[in-house]
Design a protein with these regions (language model features):
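Pentatricopeptide repeat
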Residues: 66-70, 97, 101, 117, ...
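Inward-facing hydrophobic residues that define packing positions of alpha-helical scaffold repeats
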Residues: 88, 101, 108, 121, ...
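N-terminal targeting peptides
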Residues: 1-222, 231-242, 246-249, 270-274, ...
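C-terminal interaction modules of eukaryotic adaptor/scaffold proteins
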Residues: 568, 573-576, 580-628
Length: 628
């Protein structure tokens, strides 16, 4: 009955999702079985080699050894793995062939550490000496030749495949072992599960897990933790939580790693309350929270902007005798920088230094960025110098912050000096780097240079993204070169770069600036046809375009459509309408709009009053009311 209950609980898992596990994965290709060369064991060269290895007389080893002679010597030394290791370490890899490598691997697998055998297998895989199937067959033949009964040499082949980032080869070895009536160790299976998970191939992870289950390979806590992680990566958090009960039904106690995995899943999805529930469950089961648990919660709270709670959790962590690491401090620093609370952010930086925790580049980057946002450029520069003085090298993010900051300040010279410095220090520029520079060149009407830099991006092996295209389109629109701007839109389509609402808003603004509001209106339909929803800026742009032309009927039509779509009018909306009404000498309606905007809590600015004064200067004057 217990087995039936467990299998019912297992039924919610995609154990056999879209696979027929009875279908062989590998084609049944004909292959020649491995046959070891059998030279005369009385060969004087082999005899000399044998003695030289045993006596560590490496200078006596002949330089013209053939692979068959090496294989014979290895066979004779199969009971002396340490001697074989010393010999292999002194032999150039290209002197070996697949049979001699396989013999060496089988012999070296008898050493206490698997690393020497693994290293040799990794070399063979990296050199593309043979296919995985051929290596498996060669190891099987060597194992038979040496009358070696342990099967862990095949587990080593699975591990080597994982270390070489070739989990498919590891899965092939798994099936070849099953065909040979052998079963991999659970450690090998866990390694392979993790390898597929790292490769984000969760379908293969489930396939292997199902095959393990059918083959009755007993799981461990590590197995369950991996599969819980798979469910979290797939966003199936409820099933991940249920899997904890499932592992308990099999007699396994969840560990702090188990719970940390699920907590990480909840925090990454912004489900902080569910993460707190998992913390309570840990406490009920007597599982202590570790530094990583606290770090996850602090990170999750910071992402949600709940900084005071994050700080309280941090203090609780310290009070419990746990030592925060640089990552935890960096999380808090970044959180407070994002909120504009630089004094608190710097206090955490100072605290970590006092406690002997070295700041990293991730400590300094948010601080530098926050200083630039507040216009404290000299302090930002000083902080970068302090950073370098501590031996922390600026990375691409640091340079992007600096370059973008100086671009926004309009300091083109300084921005390009940093760009040159970045390249000279071997820090590769990114799309963000080039976008900032293209933007500032466009803003300073240096369109030829901006276009040249845009072309350079492709030569650097980077793909211009929508943000970079938008910056260049904005430059051409600002210079009333709409033909070139629309050519860039076509180029985006050719390069499979999907335009966004910013792209279309920029083009609409450019058309409105040259008096082509009707064409801009057509773009509104085009963007909807592409599945891009207009935003309030789209409507403000058209309202402004029609108001500038004095076409107030269409301007108010788009104001009404804007309201119907749930967008509230902004200061720009009212200013555009008031400007258009004043241009048409409709002062009464302009005054009504002024009263309306004030009643909605929108404060008029200089542009509002300038429009009213200019429009009504020859009329009856402006009636001041409602506090205006």
């Amino acid at each position: 009955m217990r087995k039936i209950r467990l299998l019912k609980r297992l039924s919610f898992l995609p154990v056999r999702p879209h696979y027929s596990l009875t279908i062989p994965i590998l084609p049944n290709q004909p292959h020649r079985p491995f046959s070891s060369p059998t030279p005369d064991s009385q060969d004087p060269t082999v005899h000399l080699l044998h003695n030289a290895i045993l006596s560590s007389q490496w200078h006596s080893i002949p330089s013209n050894l053939s692979p068959s002679q090496i294989s014979t010597a290895l066979s004779n030394l199969h009971s002396s793995p340490h001697c074989v290791l010393s010999f292999i370490q002194r032999l150039e890899f290209n002197r070996l062939d697949l049979p001699s490598i396989s013999l060496a691997v089988v012999i070296l697998s008898r050493l206490p550490s698997p690393r020497p055998a693994l290293n040799l297998l990794n070399q063979a895989i990296a050199a593309n000496l043979a296919s995985n199937r051929q290596i498996f067959d060669a190891l099987a033949a060597a194992r038979g030749q040496l009358k070696s009964t342990p099967t862990h040499v095949f587990d080593l082949l699975i591990k080597a495949a994982c270390e070489s980032n070739k989990p498919d080869d590891g899965l092939q070895t798994f099936y070849l072992m099953k065909t040979s009536k052998l079963l991999p160790k659970i450690e090998s299976c866990n390694n392979l599960l993790s390898s597929f998970l790292r490769s984000k191939r969760t379908d293969k992870t489930w396939l292997l897990y199902a095959e393990m289950f059918r083959s009755k390979i007993p799981s461990t806590v590590i197995t369950f933790n991996i599969m819980i992680n798979v469910l979290c990566k797939e966003g199936k958090l409820k099933k991940a939580k249920a899997f904890i009960s499932f592992m308990e039904d099999f007699g396994f106690k969840p560990t702090v790693v188990t719970y940390n995995t699920v907590i990480h899943g909840y925090c990454s999805k912004g489900k902080i309350e569910s993460a707190f529930e998992m913390l309570d469950e840990m406490t009920e089961k007597g599982i202590d929270h570790d530094s990583y648990t606290h770090g996850l919660m602090i990170s999750g709270l910071c992402k949600e902007g709940r900084l005071e709670e994050a700080s309280a959790f941090f203090q609780k962590m310290v009070d419990n005798g746990l030592i925060p690491n640089a990552i935890t401090y960096n999380t808090l620093i970044d959180g407070y920088c994002n909120k504009g609370n630089l004094s608190r952010a710097f206090s955490y930086r100072d605290e970590m230094c006092t406690k002997g925790i070295e700041p990293t580049v991730c400590t300094f980057n948010p601080l530098v960025h926050a200083l630039f946002i507040e216009g404290r450029i000299d302090e930002a520069d000083a902080l970068v110098k302090e950073m370098e003085g501590r031996g922390v090298s600026p990375d691409a993010v640091t340079y992007n912050i600096l370059i973008n900051g100086y671009c926004k300040e309009g300091d083109v010279k300084k921005a390009f000096e940093l760009f040159d410095e970045m390249s000279s220090k071997g820090v590769r520029p990114t799309n963000v780097t080039y976008t900032s520079l293209v933007y500032v060149l466009c803003k300073t009407n240096r369109m030829s240079e901006a276009n040249g830099l845009f072309e350079r991006v492709r030569s650097e092996g980077l793909k211009p993204d929508v943000v970079m295209f938008n910056a260049l389109i904005d430059g051409y629109c600002s210079n009333s070169n709409m033909e070139r701007a629309f050519l860039l839109l076509k180029e985006m389509d050719r390069r499979n770069v999907r335009p966004d609402e910013v792209t279309y808003n920029t083009l609409m603004r450019g058309l409105c600036m040259v008096g082509k509001a009707d064409e801009a209106r057509g773009l509104l339909d085009e963007m909807r046809g592409r599945g891009i929803e207009p935003d309030f800026i789209s409507y403000n742009t058209l309202i402004s375009g029609y108001s500038r032309k004095g076409n107030m009927n269409d301007a108010f039509k788009f104001r009404d459509e804007m309201l119907n779509r749930g967008f509230n009018p902004t200061l720009l909306t009212y200013n555009a309408l008031i400007q258009g009404l004043c241009k048409n000498e409709d002062g009464d309606q302009a005054e009504e709009l002024l009263k309306e905007m004030v009643s909605k809590g929108i404060t008029p600015d200089d542009s509002t009053y300038i429009s009213l004064i200019e429009g009504l200067s020859e009329g009856d004057g402006l009636v001041v009311s409602n506090g205006v």
